[in-house]
């Protein structure tokens, strides 16, 4: 079974069409990975589906980096 971090990064690669080595924990979806607002919405939806969770809009707005996504999912899965 993959770790949460590995699964989150795999989703980011698939959703944003970026190279795996670009998806470092400090990377910003918009500034570093070239995502636009639609990309980030689709990314949140993919995370919700993969981890069978619901991310409220006010929380989704705070998920702007790879690490923020990992942290949110880890907290939601405790």
Curated annotation (Swiss-Prot):
UniProt similarity note: Belongs to the acyl carrier protein (ACP) family.
Organism of derivation: Edwardsiella ictaluri (strain 93-146)
InterPro entries found in the cross-reference section: ACP, ACP-like_sf, PP-bd_ACP, Ppantetheine_attach_site
Assigned keywords, A-Z: Cytoplasm, Fatty acid biosynthesis, Fatty acid metabolism, Lipid biosynthesis, Lipid metabolism, Phosphopantetheine, Phosphoprotein
GO biological process: lipid A biosynthetic process
Short name of one Pfam family: PP-binding
Keyword Glycosyltransferase: no
Gene: acpP
Top-level division of the source organism's lineage: Bacteria
One CC-aspect GO term: cytosol
Function: Carrier of the growing fatty acid chain in fatty acid biosynthesis.
Domain Carrier: from-to ranges: 2-77
PTM summary: 4'-phosphopantetheine is transferred from CoA to a specific serine of apo-ACP by AcpS. This modification is essential for activity because fatty acids are bound in thioester linkage to the sulfhydryl of the prosthetic group.
Post-translational modification O-(pantetheine 4'-phosphoryl)serine, affected residues: 37
Pathway note: Lipid metabolism; fatty acid biosynthesis
NCBIfam families in the cross-refs: acyl_carrier (TIGR00517), PRK00982.1-2 (NF002148), PRK00982.1-3 (NF002149), PRK00982.1-4 (NF002150), PRK00982.1-5 (NF002151)
Protein name: Acyl carrier protein
UniProt-listed PANTHER family: ACYL CARRIER PROTEIN, CARRIER DOMAIN-CONTAINING PROTEIN
Localization terms from the record: Cytoplasm
GO function terms (MF aspect): acyl binding; acyl carrier activity
């Amino acid at each position: 079974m993959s770790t949460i971090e590995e699964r989150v990064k795999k989703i980011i690669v698939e959703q944003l069409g970026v190279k795996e080595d670009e998806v470092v924990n400090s990377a910003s979806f918009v500034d570093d990975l070239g995502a636009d607002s639609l990309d980030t919405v689709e990314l949140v939806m993919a995370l919700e589906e993969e981890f069978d969770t619901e991310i409220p809009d006010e929380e989704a707005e705070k998920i702007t980096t790879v690490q923020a996504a990992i942290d949110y999912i880890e907290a939601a899965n405790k």
